[in-house]
Regions:
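Short, contiguous acidic/charged loop-to-helix segments that flank catalytic cores in large enzymes
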Residues: 124-126, 378-379, 409, 455-457, ...
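Conserved catalytic core of nucleic-acid polymerases
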Residues: 219-222, 276, 332, 384, ...
């Protein structure tokens, strides 16, 4: 049957007599058991392909530096290493530094030269406080980015602190954070650890931390896998040391060194202090809030069961789909292999006509609030009654800061029960919270970068920018603009920044696609300079493969050259938005540094 089908396919669909200068034999896979293939599969995490290399001798050979790894615990030797590190760091040369810690400092890896690579564990006279003091000595003399390391925010707390304000006595000029530097060069990469740095900048394949230590904690590795821990500490410090100059040169050649020097490196210390300070939480208020949510969820559950005529798992899309589209006979049910879609956008269209759907949406929102915030935040409250979250510099491709453990940037504000969660965050006694933000920063950046005179004039005259846009787009006097016209103009203003299509705008405003298309066309007719500017952003990105902010932050956009329409369209939207959103991120970071 398959043979017949194949013959029919060739006969009906495939033209076999096209003259092509290509030998089918050339398409055969040759011997791919070589170092280049191994590095490629490792780079893209092709786990199944990597397994094929396990019984070959291709797997990364030990770099030459391995023979120079040396564990030292003799006090005099350790002193000599730190004294030499101070001599180097106080000049113009660099050292590599890797901090090995879990909750407590366990060891350090220090690279002084290609042949001087040391592992210094906490042992005997070499106590944790001694190591911290000697590291502080080394850092105190460095002022020319002499210490190459990575993720330095994670261990700034070990250095000597100011006795008055508790800030680390560390010059931000002491370090070059190779992870942040590599992030600026390749913001879409998944990792910036020493293994990635070695592959990217040294063309060397190092064993990863996971390959060396598996799932062992640092404390367990000290006792159970010391040889591999030595490798990890020495390899990482060596990689930082070897990469530092190459990364610096590349940043300068790409005109990004100023961004690194004046924004990203100083910001490390701002974020560190934010993490150290944390934010105070009224734990009892959080518990009470959880109870209120729990009660509301139970009431909604009962009402949903009554409307459905039976009890079922509301959290199961499959069961919910059957109830809504089969039992209750609601329209527009789209059935897939796994059942009916019950995504938010599907339910939101049904909600105006079916009260039970509104209750289901509210049930979902309240359940999310309870699990993620009311109950979820409790586990992050430290002994001091504060949440000390993590702020990340190398996660987003846009340059924005992200927040994890927990995500404090995503606390909901649109629904009343969501707003209530913010009340559990309280200032210290005698203090108040101050909320400061830029007004319409992205629209102002658009006006500045495009040079559009009408938009600039509207801002300079302190006009209501959305009302001014409505007057331009709808051709009416400013004082005759209706609230609906202003609302539509606001959606267009922000939609333009995010590269919104006519379809997206029509969904946003609940209007026809034709009307949305007309709005966008009127907008560009009113602001032709913006149209030229945005088209230029897209064409530049197509030519270069990336976009740039005003501060030369780069966003790689491989999708913009895709043959796939959807991917290419996504790339074009990114090209329109990334320079504006990225510039806004840079300006906010500068403001944080100035306030700090």
């Amino acid at each position: 049957l398959s043979l017949v089908g194949s013959e029919m396919c060739i006969r009906d669909r495939i033209k076999t007599d096209v003259p092509i200068k290509y030998n089918i034999e050339d398409a055969k896979a040759g011997d791919f058991f070589n170092e280049n293939s191994y590095e490629l599969f490792k780079k893209y995490n092709f786990k199944n392909m990597l397994k094929k290399f396990e019984n070959t001798d291709i797997i990364a050979k030990d770099p030459e530096c391995y023979e120079y790894f040396k564990k030292i615990s003799d006090f005099a030797e350790v002193e000599n290493v730190f004294n030499k590190a101070m001599d180097i760091a106080g000049g113009i040369e660099k050292i590599g530094l890797s901090i090995v810690r879990e909750s407590e400092l366990a060891a350090v890896g220090i690279t002084l030269s290609d042949t001087e690579i040391y592992y210094i564990p906490v042992s005997g006279f070499v106590t944790e406080s001694y190591l911290a003091d000697r590291l502080s000595d080394v850092v105190s003399v460095a002022s020319n980015r002499n210490i190459a390391s990575a993720n330095i925010k994670d261990y700034l707390d070990i250095f000597e602190k100011d006795k008055i304000n508790g800030y680390p006595l560390v010059s931000e000029k002491a370090f070059i954070d190779t992870a942040i530097a590599a992030y600026l060069l390749h913001p879409s990469n998944e990792s910036y650890d020493y293994e990635s740095l070695g592959r990217e900048f040294l063309s060397l394949t190092y064993p990863s931390k996971t390959e060396l230590l598996g799932k062992l904690s640092i404390n367990k590795a000290v006792n159970e896998a010391e040889n591999n821990l030595i490798k990890y500490a020495c390899l990482s410090s060596y990689a930082y040391y070897k990469c530092a100059d190459k990364i610096t040169e590349q940043l300068k050649s790409e005109n990004m060194y100023e961004l690194f020097e004046t924004i990203e490196m100083p910001l490390i210390f701002v974020l560190f202090e934010m993490q150290q300070q944390g934010i105070s939480v009224d734990k009892q208020a959080l518990v009470d809030y959880s109870k209120v949510l729990g009660t509301k969820i139970l009431v909604l559950e009962k009402e949903i069961y009554e409307a459905a005529g039976e009890e079922f798992n509301i959290n199961s899309p499959k069961q919910l789909g059957v109830i809504l589209f089969e039992k209750l006979g609601m329209p527009n049910g789209k059935k897939t292999k796994s059942g009916y879609s019950t995504a938010a956008d599907v339910l939101e269209k049904l909600a105006p006509d079916y009260p039970v759907v509104s209750k289901i949406l509210e049930y979902r929102q309240l359940s999310k609030l309870k699990s993620t915030y009311a109950d979820g935040l409790t586990q992050y409250i430290s002994e001091d009654g504060r949440i000390h979250g993590t702020f990340n510099q190398t996660i987003t491709a846009t340059g924005r800061i992200s927040s994890t453990d927990p995500n404090l940037q995503n606390i909901p504000i649109r629904m009343e029960m969501g707003k209530a969660i913010r009340k559990v965050f309280v200032p210290k006694n005698g203090f108040v919270f101050l909320d400061a933000d830029y007004s319409q920063i992205e629209l102002r950046i658009l006006a500045h970068m495009s040079g559009d005179e009408k938009l600039i004039e509207a801002y300079n005259s302190s006009a209501d920018i959305h009302r001014a846009t409505a007057a331009q787009v709808f051709g009416v006097p400013l004082d005759e603009v209706t609230d609906e016209q202003r609302r539509n103009a606001k959606a267009v203003n922000f939609g333009i920044i995010y590269g919104m299509s006519s379809f997206g705008l029509s969904q946003d405003l609940s209007i026809s696609r034709k009307e949305a298309k007309e709005y966008i066309e009127r907008y560009f007719a009113s602001y032709p300079t913006i149209k030229t500017f945005i088209d230029g952003l897209v064409s530049d990105a197509k030519e270069k493969g990336y976009s740039l902010t005003m501060y030369n932050r780069r966003r790689e956009i491989p999708e913009i050259k895709s043959s796939n329409f959807m991917q290419r369209s996504f790339g074009e939207r990114v090209a329109m938005n990334a320079p504006i959103q990225g510039t806004a991120a840079d300006i906010i970071k500068l403001a944080m540094i100035n306030v700090y």
